[in-house]
A protein has these predicted regions:
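Helicase motor core with emphasis on the C-terminal RecA-like subdomain
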Residues: 3-14, 18-22, 26-48, 56-58, ...
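Flexible coil/turn residues that form the inter-helical turn or adjacent wing/linker of helix-turn-helix
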Residues: 166, 231, 371, 421, ...
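Short helix-to-turn junction characteristic of helix-turn-helix DNA-binding domains
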Residues: 31, 227, 278, 368, ...
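Accessory DNA-binding and partner-docking regions appended to nucleic-acid-acting proteins
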Residues: 1-7, 356-358, 387-608
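Short, charged low-complexity linear segments at domain edges
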Residues: 353-382
Length: 608
């Protein structure tokens, strides 16, 4: 059998797929030829198969370096569910388990060993020397670079692998890395003339929406309505601070939403419990800081919300990538305010890599303020160009309409000028709205001619308009002067009537009714592959129930048994024999033998 046929047969037998995704076959062939590689592939794009399949085809054990115990656990469970011998050597095991794992590695009974960078460095002169290693895979490789968004110092020592094991190929994998990070990965790992594979970063199943100028109460209301529209679907809410994760979670819990909290300030036990509850669908939502997510391989996360502006496009892209890993339609929402921008600018200015972090934040700001296709901006950031708009972001769905906003701009700039440019955004809105706040009255600003000049415009709309004015360059924020607003020459031209100002019309969504929150998710979304009708929905729910029952029996996450995508395909194909069940994409030989009878018997009840 030639190499290509062997690769395809292994893919079908263990993973249940008839064909490779773009670049996978090329990457696997390259690794089988004992060559180093750097693989950039989006979350859900099939990175893992790029090293798991070569591990199955080569003699010996593949050593996979992974930064999180939870990520190792998830990967190992998925491999075992596919009938592949795998294990994870880490501190969560007891000593007996680790002794058994070491013996299995030395005896060649494992095809893949997952290990943390710290553990690998401790074992490089001991266990690794006694093993027959087929390849090294460095997962989440961006952690090696100080320019990356998840820098881990211990990753920088991975360069010793090529020195000690010069004949063993190394493949580094990441979902997000700009050019400078890619170069740093290659240099620090001492990769030997590596080939760099860059897959498309496009995730067309993920919708992109930005909501600007929302205050806390408005955000909370919008989030509740969003969750109600999504029924019981799983989602993640990312917040900038630990305190905010807890206040948002408490708000959701009071509304009866099953919600957990995850941040670095909680105990390891608490974080593990939250993650396990989420993976096993015991809670619907996790409110988290950026500490959450890298260890999540949950394929049926249907939405991601950013409560605050992320610090970089890399962080943002990786976090929205938690949604829709199964390829089904998923939604993301980013809330953006001037307060976020001011705070993040302060953090970036005080960081060790001030210039780089400010540049990354500026690119994130440009994305949030864009009035062109947002997906094109994301793809362009990662060096990928496209000539077509996506049709699945808020800009494409509702192209911005402009109006003559000269008077609005003049009111704002006049208020700034009359305070001698000594006010911040919040105080400016108080003046324009005519609010007798303590700060307004304390400084006598209620006597200004512009006091109350904009009371007909809601606070949220003022936030949006001021964001637009900042983007248009009518004023700047003096971050080193208590965030005071300074009028630019362009702003002066508008203020004194020398030029006009065009602003974008703010679009307001209608609120979801209380009745609407109980409405079932539309079948067209649940069954995007063409199935329709209540009977299909009933079958899908029955399949989901059986999957949960089987998963609970084995103490596994439900998506490890079968993904939502596979359940949808079962709804459409309705196999009535075990052989037909095994033909479904995503069902390998092991799962066919293990689960085929139960699922086929259930499907027959709907067919006969």
């Amino acid at each position: 059998m030639d190499k290509s046929a062997s690769m395809r047969e292994t893919l079908k037998t263990y993973f249940g797929y008839d064909s490779f995704r773009p670049l996978q076959e090329e990457i696997i062939r390259h690794i089988l030829n004992k060559q180093d590689a750097l693989v950039l592939m989006p979350t859900g794009g099939g990175k893992s198969i790029c090293y798991q399949l070569p591990a199955l085809l080569c003699e010996g054990t593949a050593v996979v370096v992974s930064p999180l115990i939870s990520l190792m656990k998830d990967q190992v469970e998925a491999l075992l569910a596919n009938g592949i011998a795998a294990g994870a050597l880490n501190s969560s095991n007891d000593e007996t388990e680790n002794v058994q794992l070491r013996r299995a590695c030395v005896e060649g009974r494992l095809k893949l060993l997952y290990i943390s960078p710290e553990k690998l460095l401790a074992e490089k002169d001991y266990l690794l020397r006694d093993m027959n290693i087929s390849l090294f895979a460095i997962d989440e490789a961006h952690c090696i670079s100080q320019w990356g968004h998840g820098f881990r110092p211990e990753y920088t020592q991975m360069g010793v692998l090529h020195q000690q094991f010069p004949q063993i190929p190394i493949v580094a994998l990441t979902a997000t890395a700009d050019k400078i990070t890619r170069e740093d990965i290659v240099r620090q790992l001492h990769l030997n003339h590596p080939r760099i594979f860059i897959s498309s970063f496009d995730r067309p199943n993920i919708s992109l929406t930005v909501k600007r100028g929302f205050q806390a109460k408005e955000k909370n209301k919008a989030i509740l309505e969003f969750i109600h529209r999504h029924g019981g679907e799983s989602g993640i809410i990312y917040c900038m601070s630990r305190n905010k994760t807890e206040t948002v979670a408490q708000m959701l819990q009071k509304q009866g939403i099953r919600c957990g909290v995850y941040h670095a300030g909680l105990s390891t036990q608490h974080r593990d419990e939250t993650q396990n509850d989420f993976i096993n669908d015991r809670i619907q939502v996790v409110c988290a800081t950026i500490a959450f997510g890298m260890g999540i391989d949950k394929s049926n996360v249907r939405w991601v919300i950013h409560y605050n502006l992320p610090k970089s496009i890399e962080s943002f892209y990786q976090e929205i990538g938690r949604a829709g890993r199964d390829g089904l339609p998923s939604d993301t929402v980013l809330f953006y305010s001037l307060g976020d921008l001011i705070l993040l600018t302060k953090f970036a200015s005080e960081s060790n890599q001030q210039n780089i972090n400010l540049e990354k934040l500026q690119r994130m700001q440009q994305y949030a303020e864009a009035d062109i296709c947002r997906r094109r901006i994301l793809l362009s950031y990662f060096g990928e160009t496209t000539t077509e708009d996506c049709g699945n972001c808020d800009v494409c769905k509702n192209p911005p309409q402009r109006f003559d906003g000269t008077v609005i701009v003049q009111k704002a700039l006049s208020a700034i000028a009359r305070t001698e440019q000594q006010i911040s955004i919040g105080l400016l809105i108080d003046i324009l709205r005519g609010n007798y706040s303590a700060e307004v009255t304390g400084k006598g600003y209620q006597e200004l001619k512009t006091f109350g000049a904009g009371r007909d415009i809601p606070p949220r709309d003022w936030q949006d308009y001021l964001l637009q004015m900042l983007q248009l360059g009518y004023f700047e924020i003096a971050y080193n002067e208590n965030n005071h607003l300074k009028i630019t020459s362009s702003g002066s031209n508008v203020l004194f009537g020398r030029t006009q100002a065009a602003l974008v019309v703010i679009q307001h969504e209608e609120a979801v009714t209380r009745k609407g929150k109980k409405k079932k998710v539309v079948i067209a979304k649940e069954l995007p592959f063409g199935a329709a009708g209540g009977e299909s929905q009933d079958l899908f729910e029955a399949l989901r129930g059986l999957r949960k029952q089987l998963a609970d029996q084995e103490a596994l996450p439900a998506y490890i048994v079968l993904s939502d995508k596979v359940l949808h395909l079962l709804c459409i194909s309705r196999p009535t024999t075990i052989e037909e069940f095994g033909e479904i994409s995503g069902i390998g030989e092991h799962k066919k033998k293990k689960y085929g009878k139960d699922f086929v018997n259930l499907i027959r009840q709907f067919v006969e």
